Amino acid sequence: MGTFNVSLKTLTDRVSMEVVYTPKELDQICVEIAEVNRPGLFLAGYYDYFDKLRLQIMGLAEMNFLSGLSPEKRYEALDQLFRQQPPAVIVCRSEELTPFPEMQELAQKHGVALLRSNETTCTLMGSLISVLNLELAPRITRHGVLVEVYGEGILILGDSGIGKSELAIELVKRGHRLVADDAVE
């Protein structure tokens, strides 16, 4: 069992997001952990416990906080965030919130993808976490046959040629379902 990652291309295909800026092709930028982060405390200057491997979600609270800062303080706060080089910074509610111009400038400067979504922060976070949990879930591939018998999954394992597939065929004839044969992930 190895570690898995998911590309930003997969995420933008499956979750409602569009690209504002990307330093390279979306399929070359990978996310390795299933957690996301709202960087409100980080933007306010509290830098402890910040995980730069997480996607950074900018919602209404973060954007309103930044709009209340002077241009110099806003640039400084955003520079601190983009300097961490997270996989991407995503601005939610893009119909009412537009990324600050300095966000695109800093994304280019630090090589960080900048995305936006029309979804609310909670909806986007739920969708992202769901896709990330599915794509990054630990898994192994086993040689065998997977069948569903009376609603329960049963994995039939054994040496090659002992009749695993024949057993599965008999179960299917009796109304049960074949899920996978040969290589089961």
What kind of feature is each model-predicted range?
Residues 54-57, 87-90, 112-113, 153-155, ...:
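Structural motif
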Residues 59-61, 93-94, 118, 150-152, ...:
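Fold-independent oxyanion-binding glycine-rich loops
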Residues 131-151:
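P-loop NTPase nucleotide-binding/switch module
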Residues 85-90, 94-131:
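Charged, amphipathic alpha-helical linker segments immediately N-terminal to NTP-binding catalytic cores
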Residues 1-82:
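Gly/Thr-rich phosphate-binding loop signature of adenosyl cofactor/nucleotide-binding cores
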Residues 80, 106, 170-171:
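Hydrophobic/aromatic ligand-binding patch that stacks against planar heteroaromatic rings
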Residues 151-179:
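Glycine-rich phosphate-binding P-loop
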Residues 137, 174-185:
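Short beta-strand-centered segment that lines the nucleotide-binding/catalytic pocket of NTP-utilizing
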